[in-house]
């Protein structure tokens, strides 16, 4: 039975989802931080000892392999201060996470349509970490580049979110302007995926309400689905019961358990700005 049969709801498959009108934007403000130049910070790759030719990774999907070695994640300390950069590959090796305490900056996008339904994705089966788990709209990393290191009002992270929504879901930049993302908070968590890979992230939680056209990239996304609040609760129950092998990503589950329902209230009321807390880093 396919993963889609786990839902007693219509499934949005990998085709265009045409929705036209845009929704009202949310403004936000929080403590400004200074920008950082990528030239000033160390590259930690010399300390990792990982080679791209590692035969143990010969079976890795070609697209995912390229991203693992080409993408440079932003290394931070537990106060979210940038301390360097390293490859996506090195940042997700559990041996580096445990031995070197490598922590990288990340973001999680929660996109709602004008009916206040949340767009979820099931990660592709070729993903290196957490394949085929269901998660929020888009989860990725700002890269070690000038446009994504801008810290004032989390602009670098918002730029990265716009980039990855196009990469993963085919959502064009015009449909998700960077000014309409509302960063609500940050959380720090660690989660192993298997014996080799895992996550150790300082995750920015970004909310946006827009009606968008979705064209998922099969290299990144297996399926997508909009869910209401009640439908999400049923999904969580199925995951807890282990029905049909359904799994949720650990970061998504942390947000669901700690923040999502109260923030969903603000989505429906149009009061997201009242929920913003970018001073606290929640260690979960």
Curated annotation (Swiss-Prot):
Its cofactor is Mg(2+). Its main location: plastid. One of its GO terms (biological process) is flower development. Residues 102-254 form the Nudix hydrolase domain. It catalyses: isopentenyl diphosphate = dimethylallyl diphosphate. Its EC number is 5.3.3.2. A motif (Nudix box) lies at residues 140-170. Substrate binds at residues 88, 123, 127, 140. It is found in: Plastid, Chloroplast. This is Isopentenyl-diphosphate Delta-isomerase II, chloroplastic. It comes from Arabidopsis thaliana.
């Amino acid at each position: 039975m396919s993963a889609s049969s786990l839902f007693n709801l219509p499934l949005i498959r990998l085709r265009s989802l045409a929705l036209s009108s845009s929704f009202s934007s949310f403004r936000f403000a929080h403590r400004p931080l200074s920008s950082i130049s990528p030239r000033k910070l160390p590259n930690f790759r010399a300390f990792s000892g990982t080679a791209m030719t590692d035969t143990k990774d010969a079976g890795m999907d070609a697209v995912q392999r390229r991203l693992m070695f080409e993408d440079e994640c932003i290394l931070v300390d537990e106060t979210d201060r940038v301390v360097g950069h390293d490859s996506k590959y090195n940042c997700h090796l559990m041996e580096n996470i445990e031995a070197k305490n490598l922590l990288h900056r990340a973001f999680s996008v929660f996109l709602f349509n004008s009916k206040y339904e949340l767009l979820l994705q099931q990660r592709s089966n070729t993903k290196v970490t957490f394949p085929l788990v269901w998660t929020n709209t888009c989860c990725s990393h700002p890269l070690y580049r000038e446009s994504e290191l801008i810290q004032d009002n989390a602009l670098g992270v918002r730029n990265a979110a716009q980039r990855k929504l196009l990469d993963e879901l085919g959502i064009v930049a015009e449909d998700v302007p960077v000014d309409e993302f509302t960063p609500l908070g940050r959380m720090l968590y660690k989660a192993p995926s298997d014996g080799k890979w895992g996550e150790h992230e300082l995750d920015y939680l970004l909310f946006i309400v827009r009606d968008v056209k979705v064209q998922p990239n099969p290299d990144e996304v297996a399926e997508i689905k909009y869910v209401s609040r009640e439908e999400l609760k049923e999904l969580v129950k199925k995951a807890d019961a282990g029905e049909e092998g359904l799994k949720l990503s650990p970061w998504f589950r942390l947000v669901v358990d700690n923040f999502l329902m109260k923030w969903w209230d603000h989505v429906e009321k149009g009061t997201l700005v009242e929920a913003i807390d970018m001073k606290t880093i929640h260690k979960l």
